[in-house]
Amino acid sequence: MFETMRRPAIALASILTLASCAVFAPPYDPTLDSKITTAYEGVAKLAAEAEMGLYVDKATYPGKIETYANIQAALAVAAVRAATQPYAAKPAQKAIDAEVSLIKGCSAQVQGLAQLHQLQGIVPNTGATTAMMVSCDQAAKAVTAMK
């Protein structure tokens, strides 16, 4: 008797689990994932170059404006995509809001590093890139967690 009841119970539990995903998390968006990945890769490369001493001189800033702009553009698209995701219930909206907040936090850190680079250059091994890397890592993980 318990064997015959077990299958429907497992099926019901599976359906409820899948249905709860729509309640607690927004649907996966491949464009959002692609944009945050592009931005994160740009941030990681920029941080690695800075930590290797390539940007000690503020005169190197004009040569990296395009890199900063590309990262910021990818983050802007990611933030818009994240903010406009459809959702089924309030918990999913909270997840979306957190995702957008993390993306905007990453963008603010990139902007801060760009300003530092422009004003005085980036000295390696001073932690100048750490906040940006941590913030952008959190944003990327939040987006990829929706897969």
Model-predicted regions and their roles:
Residues 22-24:
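Bacterial signal peptide processing site
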